[in-house]
Amino acid sequence: RSANEREQLAQDWLALTVERDIHQFTKYKFDSDDALEILNAIAILENPNLANISKKVKVPARRVQSYLKILKMLFVIFEITPSKDSAGKSQFFLIDPILLGHFKASFEKKILTWIYLEMLCQLSYKAKKSNRISFYKTAKSSPVHLMYEADNHIVFAKVCFEQSFDSRDLLIFDSIKKKYKDKKLKLYLFYGGRERFNVDEIQILPWESIV
């Protein structure tokens, strides 16, 4: 599809969502403009949790929470929760990449959303008992963007948004290996380069290898 066609699709879907679909839930008395602003905030915020979305759109958090609940039910957004051992709050993402283009989301947000959607699709396709993915973060570290428990191991994957990386990007994996020393782990770093190799039991892979 051309850029114009993608933009028209985004506008049509947004119009249906904020002007029709959300108003089927009459008890909430939703506002179309607020709904559109919330979707825009989800697209552009680096850390799109409830508090940050509320602050961005200047709508009380409890009210924003109602919008998020219904937008999830309508399959417009999805939620990534922190793991049970992690710091941080749940984050929300748009479920269609076309909307990211419409809202002028950053390159980093597009890459991260695409990776989350790919993993959710793969886990659903493989009919995994648990297709819940989460993120892992300590109070002082940058996040490991993806964590999920498979049948006999735990997967941790960090996304680097550059074509190269350095040792600082790998530091969080040291604490993960210590914390989960009794578990079988699979550790990944996805980056914008082309080469595939291992560093200290961490598989370094290009972004597209997740497909």
Model-identified regions with their sequence ranges:
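Active-site ExK catalytic segment of metal-dependent nucleases
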Residues: 149, 154-165
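Domain-level recognition of nuclease-like catalytic cores that cleave nucleotide substrates
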Residues: 192-211
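Short, hydrophobic beta-strand segments that form beta-sheet elements in well-ordered domains
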Residues: 185-191
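Short active-site-adjacent structural elements
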Residues: 144, 165-167, 195-199
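Active-site-adjacent loop/helix micro-motif of nuclease/hydrolase catalytic cores
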Residues: 163-173
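Arginine/glycine-rich "motif VI" loop of SF2 helicases in the C-terminal RecA-like domain
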Residues: 124-128, 174-183
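Accessory nucleic acid-recognition modules appended to NTPase machines
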Residues: 3-153
